[in-house]
Swiss-Prot record:
Organism: Streptococcus mutans serotype c (strain ATCC 700610 / UA159)
Residues annotated as transmembrane: none
Broad class of the protein's primary localization: cytoplasm
Any single GO CC term annotated in Swiss-Prot or TrEMBL for this entry: cytoplasm
EC nos: 3.1.26.3
Domain RNase III stretches: 1-134
Matches recorded under Pfam families: dsrm, Ribonucleas_3_3
Family classification: Belongs to the ribonuclease III family.
Keywords from the named record: Cytoplasm, Endonuclease, Hydrolase, Magnesium, Metal-binding, mRNA processing, Nuclease, RNA-binding, rRNA processing, rRNA-binding, tRNA processing
Designated name of the protein: Ribonuclease 3
Assembly description: Homodimer.
UniProt-annotated binding residues for Mg(2+): E47, D120, E123
């Protein structure tokens, strides 16, 4: 397997000046915690920075591409692009999952393919790239990796899964649809929420996300898929 540095250079023409910064971006908290005595840095702070630069870059792209769209529509489109599932997909497409350093427990539990970890990794890489090479380098990378996917997948057709679920379930009359936070974890700047959706107090499904709203949408999406399968 190619080294991470070689892959970045060959596939994206990216060469990090600060090698430690790149290594930190690919170090999960579980790995750092298992090697506390070595005082290894993990990628949560870089993830915080990467999230901000991703939001900025995608917002700028959408603002320019869709001059007639209202703020609400642009916000929905951006949410679909930067949601956890999408970012994890971008990480996999770049084969970043092969290079992240995980703790033994996280590795055994399937962390290398977990959307939460891979989405955070993608943001951490963007944060590291911003610090090492600047905003133009981040924009160039996103133009290679994210923008083509956005244009091919037609994110203009944004689906509000909560509304779609409500419309589906209320065909047969009034029903009570409720969303409940099951779990809240992670540090203040990188929260993860797990939310359950129920109909008339009977749980349909659950979902996770970096905010309650995103977790609710994911729960509604999973419920729709479950109902469509007839299970």
């Amino acid at each position: 397997m190619k080294t991470l540095e070689k892959k970045l250079a060959e596939d994206f023409k990216i060469v990090f000046s600060d090698k430690e910064l790149l290594e930190t971006a690919f170090t999960h908290t579980s790995y750092a915690n298992e090697h506390r005595l070595l005082n290894i840095s993990h990628n949560e702070r870089l993830e915080f920075l990467g999230d901000a630069v991703l939001q900025l870059t995608i917002s700028h792209y959408l603002f320019d591409k869709y001059p007639q769209k209202a703020e609400g529509d642009l916000s929905k489109m951006r949410s679909m692009i930067v949601r956890e599932e999408s970012l994890a997909g971008f990480s996999r497409n770049c084969h970043f999952d092969r290079y992240i350093k995980l703790g033994k427990g996280e590795e055994k539990s399937g962390g290398r393919q977990r959307d939460t970890i891979l989405g955070d990794l993608f943001e951490a890489f963007l944060g590291a790239l911003l610090l090492d090479a600047g905003l133009k380098a981040v924009e160039a990378f996103l133009n290679q990796v994210v923008i083509p996917k956005v244009e091919n997948n037609n994110y203009e057709r944004v689906t509000d899964y909560k509304t779609a679920l409500q419309e589906l379930l209320q065909v047969d009359g009034d029903v009570l649809i409720d969303y409940e936070v099951l779990k809240e974890s992670g540090p203040a700047h990188a929260k993860c929420f797990e939310v359950a959706v129920s109909m008339n107090h009977e749980k349909l499904s659950s979902g996770t996300g970096k905010s309650k709203k995103l977790a609710e949408q994911e729960a509604a999406k999973n419920a729709l898929e479950k109902l469509q399968r007839g299970s």
